[in-house]
């Protein structure tokens, strides 16, 4: 895909997230690898619903600005994940309602914030690790995500939001949407007796994904 096509897709996805209520104001950011040495990321303070192709930030892997506006302050953790995991091609970070609500709950399992109860959660991301709370923009977030970048596709930032990776922007977006729907179901089912997937069922789904 050309640089221009990647930029147009990012603008399109940002608007789609915004119009469907996955993000508000200037919250959240998106990024995608353009090649081995360059990353496209949303600019600082930008609304995902009002992105423009011309203003999207192009960075090298060291964070130097090659084109467009100044990048989001959270571009640091995007770059850290790309450096650690070559298979990570795109990243979506949102403060979507249900995943952010989930991130504010105490005593979540740090290895998997939601015990699997649908096959789609397992097939899409496998699990969602919980990152301890740090202020937005803290270098500790980049450190934590870098340390885990090879161990999963989805990470819940405590009291903050979600970070989701994919093989491209569309895949990362699809993964994020599946997670938000799973979190919505989690809250909808509160007070009900949930039938969780068994370890055998989870393992079967994981094996089918290999």
UniProtKB/Swiss-Prot annotation:
Active site positions: 74, 120
GO CC list: cytosol
Free-text remark on how the cofactor is bound: Binds 1 zinc ion per subunit.
GO term, biological process aspect, one: pentose catabolic process
Keyword Cytoplasm: no
Catalytic function, reaction form: 3-dehydro-4-O-phospho-D-erythronate + H(+) = dihydroxyacetone phosphate + CO2; 3-dehydro-4-O-phospho-L-erythronate + H(+) = dihydroxyacetone phosphate + CO2
Cofactors that this protein relies on: Zn(2+)
Pfam families: Aldolase_II
SUPFAM superfamilies assigned to the protein according to its UniProt record, in alphabetical order: AraD/HMP-PK domain-like
SMART domains for the chain: Aldolase_II
Sequence similarity: Belongs to the aldolase class II family. AraD/FucA subfamily.
UniProt cross-references to PANTHER family, sorted A to Z: 3-OXO-TETRONATE 4-PHOSPHATE DECARBOXYLASE-RELATED (PTHR22789:SF0), FUCULOSE PHOSPHATE ALDOLASE (PTHR22789)
Protein name: 3-oxo-tetronate 4-phosphate decarboxylase
Organism the protein comes from: Haemophilus influenzae (strain ATCC 51907 / DSM 11121 / KW20 / Rd)
Gene (name only): otnC
């Amino acid at each position: 895909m050309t640089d221009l096509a990647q930029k147009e897709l990012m603008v399109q996805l940002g608007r789609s997230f915004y119009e469907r209520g996955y993000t508000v104001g200037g919250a959240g950011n998106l990024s995608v690898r353009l090649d081995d040495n360059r990353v496209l990321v949303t600019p600082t303070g930008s609304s995902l619903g009002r992105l423009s192709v011309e203003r999207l930030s192009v960075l090298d892997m060291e964070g130097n600005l090659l084109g467009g506006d100044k990048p989001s302050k959270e571009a640091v953790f995007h770059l850290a994940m790309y450096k650690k995991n070559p298979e990570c091609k795109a990243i979506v970070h949102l403060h979507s309602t249900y995943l952010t609500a989930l991130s504010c709950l105490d005593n979540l399992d740090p290895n998997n914030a939601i015990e699997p109860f649908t096959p789609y959660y397992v097939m899409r991301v496998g699990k969602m690790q919980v990152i301890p709370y740090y202020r937005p923009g803290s270098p500790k977030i980049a450190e934590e995500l870098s340390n885990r970048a090879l161990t999963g596709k989805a990470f819940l930032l405590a009291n903050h939001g979600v970070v989701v990776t994919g093989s491209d922007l569309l895949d990362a977006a699809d993964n994020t949407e599946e997670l938000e729907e799973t979190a919505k179901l989690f809250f909808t089912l509160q007070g009900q007796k949930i039938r969780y997937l068994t370890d055998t069922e989870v393992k079967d789904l994981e094996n089918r994904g290999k």
